[in-house]
UniProtKB/Swiss-Prot annotation:
This is BRISC and BRCA1-A complex member 1. The modification Phosphoserine is found at S8, S29, S49, S57, S62, S66. The modification N-acetylmethionine is found at M1. SUPFAM superfamilies: vWA-like. The gene is BABAM1.
Length: 329
């Protein structure tokens, strides 16, 4: 009696398996290799299909940053760049612009277009007005709010789709000496004034709007007043909330025992658990043009822009390598 041998895969089946294992290359049309993410990465967000409008966090306890001195400040490791996919749609934005009014913003150190010295507050006011008016031309349903930050936070202009209403509050501002930075109070105020949208399926259903906070910040390195509460954790994990930062620093290297501006910049970046926000740093003694360039890069819709490490601002592909340092942070 003959014993049947176990069937072995044919050559055609082996070729099909080899082709299926080859990932698509990362190109301009597929900058993140989105269709080729590992099954395990997609499984981490599959449970969101019922829909609570939140993305999974890589490490729930990584953002507990309450502490006394710079020595005890532990910056969490960087979060994965992408944890969830959302529809790339140009839905309305609720943009909350948070402008720092510390005395560092009034120091005339930035080099203006004509070579004279100007301060970061004047440049920030102009670039914010240009940003708001340009976003309004792109989509008149976008809404904007202005929050000023010193020792406390104040909501100056409520959410409005009229750029003139925000700009009327933008220029009559004065700086002050600030002893602390109450980051927790800032996020609590944002939570009180806004409501994050919820969809039944975050991967297929576009949200009615997204909420984006843009913080223009300029202070010596100091540990902010911040402890991660459950409502804040949910806010940061929501796929429709974005926290962009433009950090204007002194550019000098502090002593080893002192906190550096790089520590502060790393801390701001660690708040983004989804890897979807943009962070820029600009030296206070540099050209004012750099600040305008950073704000221009924030014009892109947060649901339609790639991860910051994949962002490219050149017109020709051969220019990518030459400007890589300028295009990514």
């Amino acid at each position: 009696m003959e014993v049947a041998e176990p069937s072995s895969p044919t050559e055609e089946e082996e070729e099909e398996e080899e082709h299926s294992a080859e990932p698509r290359p990362r190109t301009r049309s597929n900058p993140e290799g989105a269709e080729d993410r590992a099954v395990g990465a997609q499984a981490s967000v599959g449970s969101r299909s019922e829909g609570e409008g939140e993305a999974a966090s890589a490490d729930d306890g990584s953002l507990n940053t309450s502490g006394a001195g710079p020595k005890s400040w532990q910056v969490p490791p960087p979060a994965p760049e992408v944890q969830i996919r959302t529809p790339r749609v140009n839905c309305p934005e609720k943009v909350i612009i948070c402008l720092d009014l510390s005395e560092e913003m009034s120091l005339p150190k930035l080099e203006s277009f004509n070579g004279s010295k100007t301060n970061a507050l004047n440049v920030s006011q102009k670039m914010i007005e240009m940003f708001v008016r340009t976003k309004h031309k792109i989509d008149k349903s976008h809404e904007f709010a202005l929050v000023v930050v010193n020792d406390d936070t104040a909501w100056l202009s409520g959410l409005t789709s009229d750029p003139r209403e925000l700009c009327s509050c933008l220029y009559d501002l004065e700086t002050a000496s600030c002893s602390t930075f109450n980051l927790e109070g800032l996020f609590s105020l944002i939570q009180q004034k806004t409501e994050l949208p919820v969809t039944e399926n975050v991967q297929t259903i576009p949200p009615p709007y997204v909420v984006r906070t843009i913080l223009v910040y300029s202070r010596p390195p100091c540990q902010p007043q911040f402890s991660l509460t459950e409502p804040m954790k949910k806010m940061f994990q929501c796929p429709y909330f974005f926290f962009d930062v433009v950090y204007i620093h002194n550019g000098t290297e502090e002593k080893e025992e002192e906190m550096s501006w790089k520590d502060m910049f790393a801390f701001m970046g660690s708040l983004d658990t989804k890897g979807t926000s943009y962070k820029y740093e600009v030296a206070l003694a540099g050209p004012a043009l750099e600040l305008h360039n950073c704000m221009a890069k924030l014009l892109a819709h947060p649901l339609q822009r790639p991860c910051q490490s994949h962002a490219s601002y050149s017109l020709l592909e051969e220019e990518d390598e030459a400007i890589e340092v300028e295009a990514t942070v």
